[in-house]
């Protein structure tokens, strides 16, 4: 029997440090399953240091709308006048090959996916330690105007109101501690008996053989 993949959805308000945590955690060699980040498509402009095909697939609105019309997205949403979406083929291929997939999406995308998948899926919401710290991080990024930051703070409150829809919560006050908590959750999910009894079926059957 083949082990199917696991889907991990991680959401957080902008400025919480979610992307840094995700890119760091998937490099961990502690996992028992191959763990990969699903690369989302977006119509927004690349930020400094971002790489096409690593952080996002940066595409035009025309191409994104074409993909919507062709029903190519597993989920998609409009955030601050930019589209973000996850391609169906990307998720289906990785799940069918037994990969532990990490999705960096908002609560709207999480709702869409949970309405379609009920097995082998779990969700994590990352919170800032305070409103003041969240605002400070947004200002330190130096990417947005005062008006946009005010809008992002308002959006953050709306996003945080959906925390009860998630299975786990992590507070990103200290990065290393938050990273440890994220690793622990992901590893625990991989070690569930539903997955391990398939992964180690041969070993378990051998251990249960009567001595001759």
Swiss-Prot record:
Transmembrane segments: none annotated. Residues 5-187 form the Guanylate kinase-like domain. Keywords: ATP-binding, Cytoplasm, Kinase, Nucleotide-binding, Transferase. ATP binds at residues 12-19. One of its GO terms (molecular function) is guanylate kinase activity. Its EC number is 2.7.4.8. It holds the Pfam family Guanylate_kin. It is found in: Cytoplasm. InterPro entries: GK/Ca_channel_bsu (IPR008145), Guanylate_kin-like_dom (IPR008144), Guanylate_kinase (IPR017665), Guanylate_kinase_CS (IPR020590), P-loop_NTPase (IPR027417). The keyword ATP-binding applies. CDD domains: GMPK. GO terms for cellular component: cytosol. Belongs to the guanylate kinase family. Essential for recycling GMP and indirectly, cGMP. NCBIfam families: guanyl_kin. This is Guanylate kinase. It comes from Blochmanniella pennsylvanica (strain BPEN). The gene is gmk.
């Amino acid at each position: 029997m083949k082990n199917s993949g696991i889907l991990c959805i991680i959401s957080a308000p902008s400025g919480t440090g979610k992307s840094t945590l995700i890119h760091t955690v998937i490099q961990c060699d502690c996992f028992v399953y191959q763990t990969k980040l699903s690369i989302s498509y977006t119509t927004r402009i690349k930020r400094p240091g971002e790489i096409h095909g690593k952080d996002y697939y940066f595409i035009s609105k025309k191409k994104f709308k074409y993909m919507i019309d062709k029903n190519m997205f597993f989920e998609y949403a409009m955030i601050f006048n930019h589209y973000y979406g996850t391609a169906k083929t990307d998720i289906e291929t990785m799940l069918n090959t037994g990969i532990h997939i990490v999705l960096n999406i908002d609560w709207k995308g999480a709702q869409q996916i949970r309405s379609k998948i009920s097995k082998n899926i779990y969700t994590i919401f990352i919170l800032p330690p305070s409103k003041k710290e969240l605002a400070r991080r947004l200002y330190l990024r130096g990417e947005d105007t005062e008006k946009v930051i005010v809008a992002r703070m308002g959006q953050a409150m709306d996003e945080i109101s959906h925390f009860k829809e998630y299975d786990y919560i992590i507070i990103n006050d200290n990065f290393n501690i938050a990273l440890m908590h994220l690793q622990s959750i992901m590893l625990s999910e991989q070690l569930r008996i539903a997955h391990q009894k398939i992964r180690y079926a041969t070993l378990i059957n051998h251990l249960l053989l009567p001595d001759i």
